[in-house]
Amino acid sequence: MQNNTLSRPGFSLSGTALKRLACLSMLLDHIGASLLENGLFKQGAFWPGDVQLDGVLRLVGRLAFPIYCFLLVEGFLHTHDFKKYALRMLGFALISEWPFDWAFFSGVYWGHQNVYFTLLLGLLAMKALDTYQTPEGMPALKGILGAAACFLAAALLHCDYDVLGLALILALYMTRKDKRAQCIAGAVFSLFEPVAPLAFGLVWFYSGERGGSSKLEQWAFYWFYPAHIFVLGVLANLVLFR
């Protein structure tokens, strides 16, 4: 497993910096989706400006998922323990599901699963393609079938971003050896969301370095997703819009 990270003079972003930006973008997106769309708008008591605010929040929030997909590919390429990485993703997918349903659907909802499931399936699809290769280094039939099974699972589970999310992850993985091609592929495969291709303007400045972060912050990045949607669920369902 290898990738191509270019050393860029001047301005650059570490992996930690990209994670922080993605967290901020995701938070703004979910404020719009939970507090406004699943809260205020359902009450019918809102001003036209609230709709415009929601639009701005959701547009800024479109930057988060492509960045997380890129970081997932980087994580896959550099992990020393794939099994532990995958189990961590599964654990947080399970932890996040009820807060996800509560924040965005006000109760248990089986028709849409949280983004950790999407990332987990993307991780498994990359593993299949990496494990089963032809002598020329191309994906072998077993690898393709394994990736196809992940696409089927994403469709059946109705994961966040669905099969398009998986396609974006694999596009970034397949172009990992050429940063220019990777950013172009990422922009093209994220066209299903407005503004999302702009995320690769940030990815372009990725330094290839993990960046300074404590062990606590590294775990905080994982916990941020279930924690913030739980808080939004409390605000939307118990505090602001009872």
Regions from the PLM with identified roles:
Residues 1-242:
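Alpha-helical transmembrane segments and their immediate juxtamembrane cytosolic regions
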